[in-house]
Amino acid sequence: MSVRPLSTPLRQAVKHLRSLHSLSRRSRPLNPPQCLRQQHRRAGTFTTNASSLFRQNPISVSLAFLAILAGAGGLGYANYLYKTYITAAFHNYPEPVAQKLRRALYYTNTELNAQEAIKYYRQALQVAQEVGMDPFSDEIIGVKVQVAKLMEEIRQMGKAVQVLEFLRKDCLEWLRQAGEQEHNRVKRTRILAKVVGISVKLGELYGSPEIYQRDLAEERLVWAVETVLKERQRRDTIRVTEGMSEEALVEVEGPWMTDSETGAALEALAHTYEEKDQHYLASPLFLQALNLYPTKDCHAVVLMNNLASSLAQQSPRAAAAVDAYASSATITSLEAPTGPVATRESLIQNASTWAQKALDVAATVQPPTRNEECDIGCAVATHNLAEFAEMMGRKEDARRKYVEAISIARAVGFEDGVENSSARLRGLAGFGGRGGKHTKVDAPTG
């Protein structure tokens, strides 16, 4: 029996198996460590290229990097501005009203076009009425005040006055009809404070050179001051009689004007009386306003200087009643006061005392609280002390103070002070020159 025939099929089978094992295989994937090493190599290549690029073009690469940072920062800041000044500014308005106001403010603040701005303000007020907004809300009153402000900015003082007078009239009518209702107590306080502010602004506008109606200015300011003082007295009476704390009173009646706001109304009326040379009325108002400011405040320096100037320019008879006016709750008469006649020397001495107090207070105020009012106030107070010394016949003291005032004014960049003190010094030395009225301080603007 032969076994030879089996060898061929076996060899063929083995050959077939070998052919199966010889099929092409896919390359094995990189294991995880190899992948990580490859990524590191690529990262290293990028870092190397960046370093090489920086070495070749250090300025260009730095500028490009700064430009990218600036662009990213600009986008972030633009988003902040949009949310803060575009969206948040109008969140109390219904969207149809807000749309009109955005256009109005664009033509007010960005591309000044009074005609277009007024058109959109009117449309905003019309839409506000249609959607049922309260015409005496802070938002609607604010729109009307903004219209008056726009008129003032383009020097249309008459139209600004007209807008504010209409607004004042409407508010007073609401106070007359609904202000005494029990459920309107908080709203009454808020609207009354608005009318006081509007009246003070009207007093300022009536006193502007474009209009210059001093009687109307005085009328509006007297009303504002009397209203402020009467309301303060009324609230004090309620607090005492009902045994309420200030917090409880605010909850029931609403917040009233701050001391600073009250002082501003008193000061505005005082300046009006000064312009009319009614210093016996201006002095107590300056004194009352001063009592409402903290002793270490730069504006207190301004008030002390103006009080000193006003005292020095009073007639002796009128000065006798200053304290009575200062302690009164209301201003009830514009007639000249009567009483024992003060001497000229006592008036000047009182004025000197207040000027020196202004210097003492200014010396205690340090940055960041200290501002331009303190710096200019020092120059003015020193100049006034020189004038008071000159009026009392103390020529050498006056000369020394004038020189000191010039030095202070020059150091703080107060050119008017340099000019005024230099003129008085020349007059004192007998080289000519004319002195004017006593220097007073106005709060710096801008």
Give names to the regions the model predicted.
Residues M1-S60, G446:
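N-terminal mitochondrial targeting presequence
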Residues T47-A89:
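Single-pass hydrophobic alpha-helical transmembrane segments typical
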Residues T87-L281, L285, A300:
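Intrinsically disordered, low-complexity juxtamembrane tails/stalks of eukaryotic membrane proteins
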Residues A128-G132, C171-A178, V228, R232, ...:
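Alpha-helical junction/boundary sensor with strong preference for TPR arrays
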Residues V250-G254, L290-D297, T364-D375:
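Acidic, serine/threonine- and proline-rich low-complexity regulatory regions
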Residues A300-G446:
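Fungal C-terminal region signature
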